Amino acid sequence: MAMDWLGSIVSINCGDSLGVYQGRVSAVDQVSQTISLTRPFHNGVKCLVPEVTFRAGDITELKILEIPGPGDNQQVGDLHQTELGPSGVGYQMSISQNGTGKVVKKPASSSSAPQSIPKRTDVKSQDVAISPQQQQCSKSYVDRHMESLSQSKSFRRRHNSWSSSSRHPNQATPKKSGLKNGQMKNKDDECFGDDIEELPDTDFDFEGNLALFDKAAVFEEIDTYERRSGSRSRGVPNERPARYRHDENILESEPIVYRRITVPHSVSKEFCTDSGLVVPSVSYELHKKLLSVAEKHGLTLERRLEMTGVCASQMALTLLGGPNRLNPKNVHQRPTVALLCGPHVKGAQGISCGRHLANHDVQVILFLPNFVKMLESITNELSLFSKTQGQQVSSLRDLPASPVDLVINCLDCPENAFLRDQPWYKAAVAWANQNRAPVLSIDPPVHEVEQGIDAKWSLALGLPLPLGEHAGRVYLCDIGIPQQVFQEVGINYHSPFGCKFVIPLHSA
């Protein structure tokens, strides 16, 4: 009976042009002499259609790979089943272009005869005898492939019609069974038809498996092997390479000395740079003596004012935003700086700073009270400042009422303490505190002023004074004092500036 062969796994050889098909028998039609296979494989590759049908004339060789046991035929489903000829009889079948064709039934003992295939080349038929010993044959490639697919549903190989036709140009298109759009439905089932129960219950433990890997032991084994072989591509550990980089020291460096500056008197306050170098503070008397000795050796007041103005203007330009604020695209947003200067050398330093700021396209407003007699240094600086686009005012009413970008304070001088009692001084302090703009003090004094201007930044010259909290964050600028000048006043000095002229200091 035909039902006895349903569910059997067979291998059908259709010649060189059509190739070899393998699959499970789903239907045998004795009238039309056709046989149908489900889940077919063509030359080891799974077909895109769920079922193919073969004519007897197209079959060159038929092998039974596995015969199902009792009860296995029930898994085939409700299929169209007809009787099969006697066992031991082989059939020669063929597939036409539309999947149907005339059936020619021949016994296994019949002689070979060529069969004509419509629109195909002639295929030489061969006789196949089915022996009972073939029932105990081992599992074919089809079973092994089907089992691997069922064990690992996460890995699926997809093939399109282009790849199949490019590998086998003479391959006939198998018959598509099912309803309309059945092929798309089968593709969807193949991609999304996995049961959720077959997914692994636990995720892969990456950390646990990584902990099992003893990297030190593996590296030691590799190192031992490379030592024995006498060659090593990455260099032997604990051995100095033959060549050095251009920035690598060959000689061992000496221990770093962070205290390179020492002063002759006891230090009341110490600062340190970003690199850790200690910078001690000096008293006002020692600082004044240092400037006097430097002036005697050629560092005149004019040169000191110029150097102070350059360093202070560089710091002010950085505080104003640097290149992000001062560029051709922001010409309409020029920063505004208010300079508060007194009639002394400290004020002359502020005027020099304002001149350099005005040269860098900064809107500068200089406040300097009117005096009958001015210092020569102030007169010279005012003469240069008047050649810029800066504005000079002598009344606080001419200062802007709106907040400015920066206020530079040069009002205080230890040698002119009486100026703090002047009305203009008190009014200038009140204006600076009400303007709410950040304040930069240039060379501020040491004393604590009860009603002075609280600075956010302070710039010291050469060596810092023991400034208090009112000075804000302290910066130090290099005004060009030679090292031997420091030694002449009893200071063992080594420059802490490095590649800069203005460096920040931190309280030690």
From Swiss-Prot:
Residue ranges, annotated region (Required for interaction with DDX6): 191-296
Region (Disordered): 98-194
Domain Sm, chain residue ranges per copy: 1-68
Recorded GO MF terms: identical protein binding; mRNA binding
Compartmental location: Cytoplasm, P-body
Domain (YjeF N-terminal): residue spans on this chain: 283-487
Residue stretches making up the DFDF domain: 192-228
UniProt keyword Phosphoprotein present: yes
Region feature (Required for P-body targeting and interaction with DCP1A): 1-79
Keyword terms: Cytoplasm, Phosphoprotein, RNA-binding
Top-level division of the source organism's lineage: Eukaryota
InterPro entries: DFDF, FDF_dom, Lsm14-like_N, Lsm16_N, Sm, YjeF_N_dom, YjeF_N_dom_sf
SUPFAM superfamilies attached to this UniProt entry: YjeF N-terminal domain-like
PROSITE patterns per record: DFDF, SM, YJEF_N
GO (cellular component) term, any one: P-body
Record-linked Gene3D superfamilies: 2.30.30.100, YjeF N-terminal domain (3.40.50.10260)
GO biological process: deadenylation-independent decapping of nuclear-transcribed mRNA
Subunit structure: Homodimer (via YjeF N-terminal domain). Forms a complex with DCP1A, DCP2, DDX6 and EDC4/HEDLS, within this complex directly interacts with DCP1A and DDX6. Interacts with ZFP36.
The protein's role, per its UniProt record: Binds single-stranded RNA. Involved in the process of mRNA degradation and in the positive regulation of mRNA decapping.
Annotated PANTHER family: ENHANCER OF MRNA-DECAPPING PROTEIN 3
Assigned protein family: Belongs to the EDC3 family.
Free-text comment about domains: The DFDF domain is unstructured by itself. It assumes a helical fold upon interaction with DDX6.
Name of the featured protein: Enhancer of mRNA-decapping protein 3
Organism lineage string: Eukaryota, Metazoa, Chordata, Craniata, Vertebrata
